[in-house]
């Protein structure tokens, strides 16, 4: 009780997300609840944007920009950043969603609030997601209503008030064709993003609850990963998106997952636990490559997301705030390193050929004539003999 009171008085981080910028620059959006003392608000709810240093794998000490939410909006609940990096949407505790635009450049940025009329009085929205190509926005409410809209004109594709009992999680497929949603009652459904048509309800056993969902993103493996709970055992189910049939399951964490993420290149999948642990597995083998025990000690991880361009992860919790963790996964070759290696191999082959030619007679021990001389060659050119020497050698009358 004392911990809860202290957290309420000092405010807490609600969620966070990466913002992709040009030239592999990444920012971080952190949504923070208001600070309270008794029944009064001592500090308002904030939306902060921090810069990220890939060398030190850390966030800037002070935000690049800050936006203060009005008291009438309440606290932030969830955020979703557009893939283009210029807009993000934030749902609030007093109902409705807010749209924000990032304006500015290297000298400074500003967060501008804009109207989002279709979602202005939509009620409390638990989760939101932009499609991978940025052409659609989906929002899911605690009342079970699912909305899919075109972006940026916000034309309504689907407004289904009875999609679920209460929507818990959602994710778009890599090709932006499908939308997966999960419910607090343990069910999961698949929707056609283009027209909102319900395609399938995922199969599950009688004692199994599907809680979280993420599509594969490597472009070659058309899978849907779902974090599920079967009795007291947490697991990750894998579904084939061509048939929506379960292919199998894998246990990747000891505790129930509170959030899940797949890296932008689709190579890794991560689970954030209700005990504060984080597990990262390679999608190809489904084996654990990184494990952070008690990263957010005793706290359920509220949000978890891979950095778009680095093997770094952003996690948040109400007690410990935001954390940036460098993953202990195998290092990968960068593009310039591959070209450098190919150049070195080419030079090594040229040098080896030259050395072999210089020592070929002694190697094969072939006899040479009394007046015979072996021609000399240059490492980067042809024969070192002049044209006149060649002509005289063959007694040519030119």
UniProtKB/Swiss-Prot annotation:
PROSITE patterns (alphabetical): WD_REPEATS_2, WD_REPEATS_REGION
Main subcellular location: endoplasmic reticulum
SMART domains the record matches: WD40
Highest taxon of source: Eukaryota
Tissue specificity comment: Ubiquitous with higher levels in flowers, roots and senescing leaves.
WD repeats: 71-110, 120-159, 162-201, 252-291, 296-334
GO BP: any one term: phosphate ion transport
Lumenal side: 359-398
Record topology, Cytoplasmic segments: 1-337
Modification sites for N-acetylmethionine: 1
GO cellular component terms, A-Z: endoplasmic reticulum; endoplasmic reticulum membrane; plasma membrane
Membrane-crossing segments per the record: 338-358
UniProt-annotated location(s): Endoplasmic reticulum membrane
Keywords: Acetylation, Endoplasmic reticulum, Membrane, Protein transport, Repeat, Signal-anchor, Transmembrane, Transmembrane helix, Transport, WD repeat
Induction of the gene: By Pi starvation.
Gene Ontology molecular function terms on file: guanyl-nucleotide exchange factor activity
Membrane topology classification: Single-pass membrane protein
PANTHER family according to UniProt: PROLACTIN REGULATORY ELEMENT BINDING PROTEIN, SEC12-LIKE PROTEIN 1
Function: Involved in Pi uptake by facilitating the trafficking of PHT1-1/PHT1;1 from the endoplasmic reticulum to the plasma membrane.
Name of the protein described by the UniProt record: SEC12-like protein 1
Lineage: Eukaryota, Viridiplantae, Streptophyta, Embryophyta, Tracheophyta
